[in-house]
Amino acid sequence: MYPLLQLALSNIYAKMAHAKLDKPPKKLYVNNSIHSDLLWAVDHLSRLPGTHVLKSVDWDTSDADITAYCDVSLMGLGFWFPDQSVRFWSRIPEDPPKDTIFYFEALSVLSAIIHSTSLCTLVKRLVVYSDNLNTVQIFNSLSALPAYNDILKGSVDHLLSDIDNLIDLWVIHITGKLNIVADALSRQYFNTVVDYAPGIVVNTFSPPHF
């Protein structure tokens, strides 16, 4: 079983959602989006070992090799890694394809996933906190509308990028009141960030573009 690759079915499900149960079934037209999703799955299947890629989820947050906190405002995207005392900030990208804040919340989680492996020698278990419940749900269920599917596919690409070290990801909801540093970071309230996390290193980044 390859549960992480279920994202290849997102556009197929979206097409099937319009089918009428009281009508005879029709052939499914394979458009460019469906074709791209299926090729994405085939590419991973050609490289992955012949065992399931979903490892044990029976682990605690204290077992994580690295932890990130993410947040978004209309001013920017921000995430930070407390144990590494490193923060990342970016301006809001232009022309989001879907609901602005939700899309950028998901994009910030993907960005944290991508940067996590550059800060830790070996990442086997990664925890990411977000105060956006919808974002938490799509990453943990690997189920979203097609507009967000490229973000989820990007996360799976990174989790499976090293077949000898597949990464377990756990995205967890946190209340906004407890996500102070990431919130301040996204709003460019850097003085507040320093008050709560002295000595933290500031980096800018460019979010993935789809």
Where are these regions (language model features)?
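A short, polar/acidic, helix/strand-boundary loop motif
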Residues: 82-107, 111, 115, 133-151
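Mobile genetic element proteins and their domesticated derivatives, centered on retroelements
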Residues: 12, 69-71, 79, 108, ...
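C-terminal functional segments of enzyme domains
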Residues: 1, 167-210
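Flexible loop/turn segments at secondary-structure boundaries
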Residues: 12-15, 75-77, 87-88, 134-138, ...
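Two-metal-ion RNase H-like nuclease active-site motif
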Residues: 61-74
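Conserved, non-catalytic sequence blocks in retroelement Pol enzymes and Pol-derived host proteins
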Residues: 2-4, 25-38, 57-60, 95-101, ...
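RNase H catalytic domain
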Residues: 113-180, 187
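C-terminal reverse transcriptase regions that engage the nucleic-acid substrate
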Residues: 1-57
